[in-house]
């Protein structure tokens, strides 16, 4: 048997799995879109271009969006016992305009960014296998920083990929 006979062509990547998470889990969720104040009829391309950006250090200006989520991947530096197994951190930076921070609930006691973080946790952790990815909750915290009128809340998950 030749070496080429043992090779199986890769037809799906881990990146494809994350795109499926956005397409099939995050974007269709009405409650999350309501918390993010996304206008009715916004298509998925505008959603990922304007409201749910995948970029570690975006240069997109926050203009009239009341809520924006910027997500990024970071490879884990410590080993997992095999070169073929890689750990990743998926981090979400949730920016919420101060004008709408306390308007998510009727009693105005809950912060919108915390409710969005809870919803993302629910969506990614409710099933063991979320579009072929298994997420573990890692950490969440208020950054206590402002971006000219916006509050920032950070949410981090951990997942593993194989070669």
Regions found by a protein language model. Name each.
Residues 1-82:
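Small/polar-rich, solvent-exposed N-terminal microdomains that initiate assembly or binding
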Residues 14-15, 110, 114:
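Hydrophobic, well-ordered secondary-structure segments
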Residues 22, 26, 69, 92-94, ...:
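Hydrophobic beta-strand residues in large extracellular and virion-surface proteins
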Residues 33-35, 39, 64-65, 112-163:
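Acidic-leaning, charged glycine-interspersed low-complexity segments
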Residues 83-102, 148-163:
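Oligomerization/assembly interface segments of phage tail-like spikes and tubes
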Residues 99-112:
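Short histidine-centered catalytic/ligand-binding loop motif
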């Amino acid at each position: 048997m030749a070496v080429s006979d043992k090779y199986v062509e890769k037809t799906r990547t881990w990146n494809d799995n994350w795109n499926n998470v956005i397409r099939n889990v995050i974007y269709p969720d009405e409650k999350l879109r309501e918390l993010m104040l996304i206008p009715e009829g916004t298509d998925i391309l505008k959603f990922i271009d304007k409201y749910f950006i995948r970029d570690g250090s975006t240069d997109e200006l926050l203009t009239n969006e009341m809520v924006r989520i910027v997500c990024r991947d970071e490879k884990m530096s410590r080993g997992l016992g095999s070169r073929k197994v890689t750990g990743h951190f998926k981090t979400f930076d949730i920016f919420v305009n101060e004008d709408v921070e306390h308007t998510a609930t009727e009693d105005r006691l809950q912060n919108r960014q915390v409710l969005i973080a809870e919803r993302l946790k629910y969506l990614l952790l409710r099933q063991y296998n979320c579009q072929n990815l298994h997420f573990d909750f890692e950490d969440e915290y208020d950054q206590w920083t402002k971006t000219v009128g916006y509050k920032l809340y950070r949410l981090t998950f951990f997942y593993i990929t194989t070669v």
